[in-house]
């Protein structure tokens, strides 16, 4: 099993301190895995590692490159893509999440009991339906006395408008909203105005259109059903990698996007009868991140909101 690093994202395409691209893909049933660079017309071979992971380190991948992951010759978007500029069926685009220039170094998250929350849908909150449109209306929210906004899910879904609960790329920020850098810019602007940011995330199911995860591995299980389709595989065979995938996702929002709290959708549908429920493990991992990498911004970053009373003791951090 690949090690979970709370200080950086491992899955997908990321960059080392030396600027080299590090690629990591979980595809336990594949015989060959490559990266196809669309614009450069280059194919890079990944090496088969333990537990179904494939990887390579290369200087040939740079930010802005569009690419596909090739599984036994079939081209697919990266399951850990952070940007899908052409939507769910198009190529993934390489983004260096660490390149954004943050100005919120003095931000300290406010206590949860002081949150005055405005829940908003990015696509309908402003005339442009974008993160930039939210920034333009921040003075209005400040005037209302809002201290936190809760953004409905932004994981890439099919089309330009959706409630957000049909996302199929959990790491990718919706292209029609502006993509990942625009979300970083929004959070930075919110903190400058004294507003905390809560992000709604969905870990119990994926949407019906554009879902490539089953082609990579057993991300789903037939042990359980949800009202929205197959349940995610948190406790069946090969579930360690699936648990890792969603754990990396939660940590990414806190670390790379400076999100202050996560609202987990329908936690009752996260079916897990492991000795340690995934939600409890999430609590421990976020606490570890909070203790090891705390900054002025992070002193209260380990607070998470949940949808049910049952889940609150597992996800609330004090």
Give the location of each predicted region.
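Aromatic- and glycine-enriched glycan-recognition loops and surfaces
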Residues: 50-54, 58-63, 124-196
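Hydrophobic faces of well-ordered beta-strands that scaffold small-molecule active sites
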Residues: 116-120, 149-151, 197-199, 262, ...
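Aromatic- and acidic-residue-enriched carbohydrate-binding clefts of CAZyme catalytic domains
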Residues: 116-117, 155-193, 207-259
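The feature marks proteins involved in alpha-glucan
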Residues: 1-22, 41-119, 124-129, 140
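Short proline/glycine-enriched turn/loop motifs at strand-loop junctions of beta-rich domains
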Residues: 26-33, 61-62
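Conserved, mostly hydrophobic/aromatic
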Residues: 25, 69, 120, 141, ...
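Short, solvent-exposed turn/loop segments enriched in Gly/Ser/Thr/Pro and often Arg
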Residues: 151-160, 201-213, 266-271, 296-302
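Active-site-proximal helices and loops of the catalytic beta/alpha 8
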Residues: 39, 44-48, 191, 255, ...
């Amino acid at each position: 099993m690949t090690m979970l690093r709370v200080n950086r994202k491992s899955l997908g395409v990321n960059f080392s301190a030396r600027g080299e691209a590090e690629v990591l893909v979980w595809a336990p049933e594949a015989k060959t895995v490559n990266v196809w660079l669309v614009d450069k017309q280059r194919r890079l071979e990944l090496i088969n590692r333990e537990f179904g992971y494939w990887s390579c380190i290369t200087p040939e991948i740079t930010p802005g490159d569009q690419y596909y992951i090739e599984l036994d010759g079939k081209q697919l978007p990266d399951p850990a893509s952070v940007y899908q500029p052409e939507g769910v069926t198009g190529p993934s685009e390489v983004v260096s999440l660490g390149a954004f220039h943050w100005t919120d170094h003095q931000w300290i998250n406010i206590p949860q009991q002081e949150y005055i929350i405005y829940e908003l849908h990015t696509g309908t909150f402003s005339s442009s339906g974008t993160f930039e449109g939210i920034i333009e209306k921040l003075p209005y929210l400040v005037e209302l006395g809002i201290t936190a906004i809760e953004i409905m899910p932004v994981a890439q879904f099919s089309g330009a408008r959706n409630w957000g609960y049909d996302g199929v790329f959990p790491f990718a920020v919706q292209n029609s909203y502006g993509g990942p850098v625009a979300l970083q810019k929004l959070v930075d602007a919110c903190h400058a105005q004294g507003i905390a940011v809560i992000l709604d995330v969905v870990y119990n199911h994926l949407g019906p259109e554009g879902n490539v995860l089953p082609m990579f591995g057993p991300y789903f299980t037939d042990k359980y059903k949800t009202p929205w389709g197959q349940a995610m595989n948190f406790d069946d065979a090969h579930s360690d990698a699936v648990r890792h995938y969603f754990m990396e996702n939660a940590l990414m929002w806190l670390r790379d996007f400076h999100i202050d709290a996560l609202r987990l959708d329908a936690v009752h549908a996260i079916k897990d009868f492991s000795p340690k429920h995934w939600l409890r493990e999430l609590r421990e991992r976020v606490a570890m991140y909070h203790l090891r990498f705390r900054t002025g911004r992070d002193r209260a970053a380990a607070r998470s909101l949940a949808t049910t009373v049952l889940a609150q003791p597992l996800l609330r951090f004090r």
